[in-house]
Design a protein with these regions (language model features):
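Active-site neighborhoods of divalent-metal-dependent phosphate/nucleic-acid chemistry enzymes
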Residues: 74-117
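Short beta-strand segments at enzyme active-site cores
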Residues: 41-43, 113
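Active-site phosphate/pyrophosphate-handling residues
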Residues: 9, 27, 44, 81, ...
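Short, well-structured N-terminal submotif of metal-dependent ribonuclease cores
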Residues: 1-41, 54-61, 128-140
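Acidic, PIN/NYN-like endoribonuclease modules and their adjacent C-terminal/linker elements
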Residues: 3, 72, 104-140
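A generic structural signal for short hydrophobic patches within well-formed alpha-helices
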Residues: 11, 46, 83, 118-119, ...
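Active-site-proximal, substrate-binding regions of enzyme catalytic domains
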Residues: 26, 36, 44-83
Length: 140
């Protein structure tokens, strides 16, 4: 079973029902709910989601939404090792590198993000948009 790491923007699409992104992000999430993939996110993802969503839907709704999503998303550990690796990396985006290191520690097969800049390290974990992942998944 594929282990996928969900970047912050994917969970925000669902919590905030952001258009036109909701359908693709929700379809990825549905694969996790139905047990076809295992979904992971880092503690940083959860914090960033609540922080960002509270501005648009309010704090309590942001917490409620994350609680609902957390039933299906495993927490990828982020500790001293991931912080050290991110600090020693030569990438230009520290937060993306932290996320990448959390995904690597959780042995994720890929990262799903809508981040078009994709400043993640290029060391082996594929980076895909929700649409790319869904197309790839349905071709398996």
């Amino acid at each position: 079973m594929k282990r996928i790491f969900l970047d912050t923007n994917i969970l925000l699409d669902i919590i905030e029902e952001r258009q036109p992104f909701l359908v693709a992000s929700a379809n990825v999430f549905d694969l996790g709910i139905s047990g076809h993939v295992q979904m992971f996110a880092s503690p940083l993802t959860f914090a960033n989601c609540v922080y960002t969503a509270r501005k648009n839907v309010g704090y309590m709704q942001a917490i409620h939404g994350m609680r609902q999503l957390k039933h299906y998303v495993r927490t990828a550990l982020m500790d001293d090792a991931q912080v050290t690796l991110a600090l020693e990396s030569d990438t230009s985006d520290f937060e993306d590198t932290l996320q990448y290191e959390a995904a690597a520690a959780a042995k994720c097969d890929l990262i799903v993000t809508r981040d078009k800049k994709r400043h993640f390290p290029q060391r082996g974990i594929p980076i895909m948009s929700p649409e790319e992942f869904l197309k790839d998944y349905h071709q398996l």
